Design a protein with these regions (language model features):
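Short beta-strand->loop
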Residues: 72-79, 164, 173-190
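A conserved helix-loop-strand patch within extracytoplasmic ligand-binding domains
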Residues: 72-120
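Short, well-ordered beta-strand elements
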Residues: 1-14, 30-35, 110-114, 214
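A ligand-binding cleft/hinge motif common to bilobed small-molecule-binding domains
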Residues: 55-69, 153-179
């Protein structure tokens, strides 16, 4: 093969991660055609055999639909470990360390939880598991972009607001601005593994050394958060962010 189609969700985090993976493909002199799309469109592309490599499926739960045998894709590698959690801005200095403590009196945490539409079900699970509605908590559903803007402003202002967020994410860049809240009941779900998917029909045609290299490629949550930050905040292209990572200039020292 001299070229591959590389699919990814049409979001900065996934676009930047795909660009990082593409560095390996380019080293084997492959031409790359990117296929950014929605979940539904990507599944249709897979079903039609239009995607050779996909970056990336969050398994075993979030993106399990991609493993439908009819799509013809197989997991490869372990790029990073997505995990959903609740956080408080570190600058708010609330002293709270657990979601369970939100049900107690005497704290000034905002009782309106602004939740992105994409994580609304998980936020509802957390509120229900810890009986937070009985303690005055409500959920305000917002479009993802609006919820991210709210979270960004709350972090910068040091407001005592619950931030419901996956990591990696650009808001985790630097890893010091958010304090995680423990989830002793496991209400928010388990950590995932971000894995590439390779089209079964072309796997035998791909260089075995390249597949081994992809299988061993690990970016980690810090790097992916930094890639996302580079695109969202520093206005870098995905290729520029991936190049900065490759040259060791992406993470703060």
């Amino acid at each position: 093969m001299t070229s591959v189609t590389l699919g990814h969700l049409d979001e900065t985090l996934h676009e930047a991660t795909a660009a990082a993976v593409a560095r390996v493909l380019e080293a084997y002199e492959l031409e790359i055609e990117y296929v950014p799309a929605t979940h539904e469109a990507l599944m249709a592309h897979m079903r039609n055999g239009d995607i050779d490599l996909f970056v990336s499926a969050w398994l075993p739960d979030v993106d399990v639909a991609y493993l439908d045998p009819a799509l013809g894709m197989e997991p490869l590698g372990d790029l990073y470990r997505p995990e959903f959690g609740w956080y408080l801005p570190t600058a708010a200095a609330t002293g709270l360390t657990s979601i369970a403590e939100l049900a107690a009196d005497g704290h000034d945490v905002n009782r309106e939880i602004v939740a992105a539409q994409s994580v609304l079900d998980r936020v509802r699970q957390g509120v229900a598991a810890y009986n937070l509605t009985e303690h005055g908590f409500t959920i305000a559903a917002r479009p993802d972009a609006e919820a991210m803007q709210y979270a960004d402003q709350a972090i910068k202002a040091g407001e005592p607001a619950v931030i419901a967020l996956w990591q990696p994410n650009f808001l985790h860049y630097g890893s010091t601005s958010l304090t995680p809240l423990l989830d002793p009941k496991g209400a928010l779900g388990t950590a995932q593994t971000a894995r590439m998917l390779v089209r079964r029909a072309v796997r035998a045609d791909l260089d075995s050394d390249m597949l081994d290299e992809l299988d061993e490629l690990t970016l980690g949550n810090k790097v992916v958060s930094a890639l996302d930050h580079a695109m969202r905040v520093e206005d870098m292209s995905a290729d520029a962010a991936a190049e900065a990572w490759q040259r060791g200039k992406l993470l703060p020292r």
